[in-house]
């Protein structure tokens, strides 16, 4: 298991600026935000320049994060389950562009939101809408050799392991998989360590942050909340995962280097104990 850090904590920096900073902390990987001010629009990113910087600073790309769309509206919108088809199309095309960027960058994964916020529609009708979009997207993902990772989150159409497992049964492709956010499952009042085993057939990448005992969805520096990371890491090791666990601390925009360093120190110590 390797540690990466998400560039979404560095929104006051350019992507070119945060690459060396993340490397200097000690991380071996970076998750690239596919939104302003980093890889947006995805088609406009200077791939040659970014690949050169990554090589210079010995960083791998853990994942392309296409979850938020502040460039167009906000964290969740346009979502996969909008009533207006043209808005769903914006999300679809953005994710396709991120898949293409992943191929050009040599990254294997693009993560996306778990459907979107619930609307005044029946739950099943929103599920059917999301399923249709994912099955259509999967054909492009397969052509490009990139896996799209759904990320369940509190308050979205998919927020728990039960939601994900029920939904994935209707997906026709192995190129739609899971971005396992440890904090999100904890917020859903599930044991993340148990969920690693339960969802192991679908996991391709992990997000990591801590959460307070209240289980309110507010990302904290690992070690400052109540998640038992030792048990989660043991489960990940038992599962045989060799990829990156990406620390995601976007609330720390004012001091991402401090937050990243504190997280790295804490997590590195835990890994030495496993």
Where are these regions (language model features)?
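Conserved radical SAM core fold
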Residues: 34-38, 70, 117-119, 210-217
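Glycine-rich, proline-tolerant flexible connector loops at the mouths of alpha/beta enzymes
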Residues: 32-55, 114-118
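Short, small-residue-enriched loops and turns at beta-alpha junctions
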Residues: 38-40, 68-69, 117-119, 154-158, ...
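Active-site acidic/histidine proton-transfer and metal-coordination neighborhood
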Residues: 16-17, 56, 73-177, 189
């Amino acid at each position: 298991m390797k540690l990466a850090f998400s560039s979404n904590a560095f929104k006051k920096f350019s992507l070119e600026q945060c690459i060396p900073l993340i490397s200097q902390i000690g991380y071996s990987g970076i998750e690239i935000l596919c939104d302003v001010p980093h890889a947006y629009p995805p088609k406009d990113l200077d791939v040659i320049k970014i690949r050169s910087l990554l090589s210079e600073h010995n960083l791998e790309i853990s994942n392309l994060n296409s979850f938020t769309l502040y460039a167009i509206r906000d964290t969740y919108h346009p979502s996969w389950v909008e009533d207006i088809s043209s808005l769903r199309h914006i999300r679809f095309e953005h994710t396709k562009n991120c898949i293409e960027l992943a191929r050009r960058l040599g990254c294997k994964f693009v993560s996306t939101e778990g459907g979107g916020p619930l609307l005044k529609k029946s739950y099943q009708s929103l599920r059917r809408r999301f399923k249709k979009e994912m099955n259509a997207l999967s054909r492009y993902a397969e052509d490009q050799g990139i896996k799209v990772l759904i990320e369940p989150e509190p308050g979205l159409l998919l927020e728990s392991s039960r939601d994900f497992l029920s939904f994935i049964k209707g997906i026709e492709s192995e190129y739609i998989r899971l971005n396992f956010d440890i904090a999100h499952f904890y917020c859903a009042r599930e044991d993340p360590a148990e969920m690693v085993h339960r969802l192991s057939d679908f996991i391709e990448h992990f997000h990591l942050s801590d959460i307070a005992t209240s289980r309110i969805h507010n990302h904290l520096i690992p070690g400052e909340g109540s998640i038992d990371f030792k048990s989660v890491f043991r489960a990940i090791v038992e599962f045989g995962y060799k990829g990156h666990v990406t620390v995601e601390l976007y609330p720390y925009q004012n001091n991402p280097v401090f937050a990243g360093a504190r997280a790295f120190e804490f997590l590195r110590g835990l890994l030495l104990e496993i």
